[in-house]
Amino acid sequence: MAEDDIRKRIEWLREEISRHDHLYHVLDAPEISDAKYDLLVRELKELAPGEDRESDSGSPISRVGGEPLKGFMRVVHDIPMLSLENAFTGEDLGSFLRRAGDVAMCCELKIDGLAVSLVYQDGIFSMGATRGDGRVGEDVTQNIRTVSGLPLELTEKISGRLEVRGEILIKSEDFAVLNAEREDQGLPLFANPRNAAAGSLRQLDPSIAASRKLSLFVYQVVSSQALGLYSHYEVLGRLKALGFPVQGTESLCRTPVEVMEFIEKWRIGRFALPYVTDG
């Protein structure tokens, strides 16, 4: 490809990715699948390898989503909520495993929901925020209080500030009921459970969020070493002990063969789960 054509392609990819970021994270109205979006991001990284999430805050791939909607207070994340890297093929996975070396890995499914930050002060839930653009999100505390499974008080009083992160979702059965109700009322249907969860969590009226049967899975403790936790597997166990809902598919894999066995187990098995996964 000629240099001029490469520049034009890079510019088109930047604009297209930014447009889809806005559709997905701000308007909750995606036009393409996550897989197609990931391919656009991968192509941009290959054509413009200097662009990444850390070095170029103006690049669309330095952002997770779009600007927060007006109507909610803004929340600046102390540690940015960045998206995960992807492996599309067995070759991609093999390359990652070789780079990682001889280490045990905690494997788990990725929930197709809305990423949130939950803050506890002395063991009491005090604030919930959306990911937003990864650096600035929206304060949706009152809506998150309505979420099924959210512990308003932890089983153990942890002094000071504790931040955990997870996904808000609507389970498949609840999504079907919600769309059936909307159809009866002549309202537009949600495209998928993720869109329904995002739209519900960002309602200005908490009673609407409460009526949507939102669920929660938590998977991360920010600054986990402060709690004496040094592995993701330990983090998940501690989250359960503190009263958080954890999805429960995690498996500690000690060899590349065990990693592949986990992937094969859930390649089809994930479709039997009561919620949607996307990785």
Briefly describe each language-model feature range.
Residues 1-278:
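RNA/tRNA-interacting regions in translation and RNA-turnover enzymes
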